[in-house]
Amino acid sequence: MLALYHFAQSTCSIKVRLLLAEKQLIWQDKMLVSSEHNHLSDWYLKLNPNGVVPTLLDENSPVFESTSILEYLEDKYTETSFRPFDHYMRSQMRAFLVFVDVWPTLAVRTPSFQFGGLLKKFSAMSDQEFSELIKKDP
C-alpha cells in the first residue's frame, strides 16, 4: 500500500496528490502538520534525510522529492500514463518540471525552512547539541 507523508498546503505535496488522484491509486494519508515540525523529527528524517515533504512510502521503501515521486508513479503504474508520447513534448514536460523544481519551489522552501522550522529547531539546541548535529551531518 502507498502512504504519502505531506503537508496540506505544500505545492510539492499537491502535485503528487493530483497524480495519485488522476491515476486513481489507493493511498494512505499521512498528513503532517507543518507548525509541529514533524518533518524535522528523527523518525521522519529516517524516511527522508532532506526533511522535506512529500515522501511516498511504497512497500516500506521511501521515495522523496516530488518530481522523483511523479516519475516513480509513472514508471510503476503504467495503466494510465500522463507523460506525452511524443519525444519533443516529453522534453518540454521535463523542462517544465525542472523549472517548477528550481524557481517556485526554492522561493517557497527557503523561507519556510528558515523561519518555519530550522530556525526554531536550531535556536532550541544547546551549543553542544548543535555542534554534534553538524559533526553528524555537515
Please give the residue ranges for each predicted region.
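GST-like domain detector, emphasizing the conserved glutathione-binding G-site
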Residues: 1-137
